C-alpha cells in the first residue's frame, strides 16, 4: 500500500481501548492529488482513525504512514507534512484571528520570512479578510470553522485531514469551502470525513465506508454504484389490472420482488417498482411481458444513489422512493 505516490497509508491497523476493539485491521491508502470521502455512522471509528493518522493516538497494531513516514517511529517528520481539522477546531478564543494563525505558523515551524505570505494565502482561501482583527470568541460558528480550516492549510501540507469541515456553515460558505478543498486536493492528499453525502459526490474521487471499525468498501462513487447494480430497481408505469401485472412481472427470470401501487395522479395507471438482479436484458424482458398485453407508459432502470449504497453497507434498509 505504501509507495512514493501514496500520501496516507494504513496497513492492518487496529485500535483497542481496554478490552474493546474500536478499529479492526484497517487497510487503505490515499494518493497525492486525491480526495477520499470517509463515511460511516456515528461511532463507526472515523474520528479514531483520523486521530491515529494525525499521531494524536497510537495504533494498537499495524502501521500508519504519512508522506512516507512511519507515524510510530517518525512522528515529527510525518507531522510536518500534515494539516488536521478536528471536528472541534483547536482555537484560542482570546486571540485575534491573525494572532492565532501566526501562533500556529510558529508551532508548525514556518520560516519567519514566509509567515506573512502564508497568512495572506489561507486568509484569502478561507474568506477571513473581514474578521482578521476580531477575537475568536466573538466569531460565529461558521467563521470559527473557517479559522480552523485556515490553520490546517498553513504550511501547504502534503496531507489534509478534515473531520466535518463544513459543520455549521451556511449554504454559501459550504460552497466556498468545498471549492477550497477541491483546489487543494488537485495536488495534495485529502481525507474528508462528512455526513453530507452530496459533498462526497461533488468533490471526492473515492469513497471509503466504515462501520464498527471495519472498512466495508472503498471505490469511486461510480464504482460503488456499479457494484450495487446487482440489487437494482426497475420502475414502470403501466395501464392494466394490478394482480395480473404483478403476476406477469414476478414470473420473469431475474425479478426478485415487485411492488405495485396506484399512480400518484389518481389515474388507472399503475406505478410498478421491481427489485431485479444484474443480468443483462432484464428491462427488455419486463417491457416485452407488459407491452404485449397492456399499455406501457414508461420504463426506466433506477441507479442507486450514494445514500442508498451507504445505508445498505451500514445495515439500514434504504427507502426505495429515494432511488432515482
Please name every model-derived segment.
Residues 178-274:
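ABC transporter nucleotide-binding domain
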Residues 127, 255-261, 295-300:
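A short linear hydrophobic-aromatic micro-motif
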Residues 11, 237, 261, 300-302:
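Solvent-exposed beta-strand sheet faces enriched in polar/charged residues
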Amino acid at each position: 500500500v505504501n509507495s512514493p505516490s501514496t500520501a496516507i497509508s494504513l496497513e492492518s491497523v487496529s485500535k483497542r481501548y481496554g478490552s474493546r476493539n474500536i478499529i479492526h485491521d484497517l487497510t487503505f491508502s490515499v494518493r497525492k492529488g486525491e480526495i477520499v470521502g470517509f463515511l460511516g455512522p456515528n461511532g463507526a471509528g472515523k474520528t479514531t482513525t483520523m486521530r491515529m493518522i494525525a499521531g494524536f493516538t497510537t495504533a494498537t497494531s499495524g502501521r500508519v504512514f504519512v508522506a512516507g513516514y512511519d507515524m510510530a517511529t517518525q512522528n515529527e517528520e510525518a507531522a510536518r507534512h500534515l494539516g488536521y481539522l478536528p471536528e472541534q477546531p483547536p482555537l484560542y478564543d482570546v486571540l485575534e484571528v491573525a494572532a492565532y494563525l501566526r501562533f500556529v505558523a510558529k508551532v508548525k515551524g514556518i520560516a519567519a520570512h514566509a509567515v506573512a505570505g502564508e497568512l495572506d494565502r489561507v486568509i484569502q482561501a478561507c474568506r477571513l479578510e473581514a474578521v482578521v482583527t476580531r477575537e475568536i470568541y466573538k466569531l460565529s460558528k461558521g467563521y470559527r470553522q473557517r479559522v480552523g480550516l485556515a490553520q490546517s492549510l498553513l504550511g501547504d501540507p502534503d496531507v489534509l485531514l478534515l473531520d466535518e469541515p463544513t459543520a455549521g456553515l451556511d449554504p454559501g460558505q459550504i460552497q466556498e469551502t468545498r471549492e477550497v478543498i477541491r483546489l487543494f486536493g488537485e495536488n495534495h492528499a485529502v481525507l474528508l470525513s462528512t455526513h453530507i453525502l452530496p459533498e462526497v459526490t461533488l468533490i471526492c474521487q473515492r469513497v471509503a465506508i466504515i462501520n464498527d471499525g471495519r472498512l466495508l468498501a472503498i471505490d469511486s462513487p461510480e464504482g460503488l454504484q456499479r457494484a450495487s447494480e446487482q440489487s437494482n430497481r426497475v420502475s414502470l408505469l403501466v395501464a392494466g389490472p394490478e394482480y395480473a401485472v404483478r403476476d406477469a412481472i414476478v414470473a420473469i427470470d431475474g425479478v426478485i420482488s415487485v411492488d405495485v401501487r396506484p399512480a400518484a395522479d389518481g389515474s388507472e395507471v399503475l406505478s410498478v417498482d421491481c427489485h431485479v438482479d444484474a443480468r443483462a436484458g432484464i428491462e427488455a424482458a419486463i417491457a416485452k411481458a407488459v407491452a404485449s398485453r397492456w399499455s406501457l407508459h414508461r420504463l426506466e432502470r433506477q441507479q442507486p444513489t450514494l445514500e442508498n449504497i451507504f445505508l445498505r453497507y451500514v445495515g439500514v434498509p434504504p427507502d426505495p422512493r429515494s432511488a432515482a
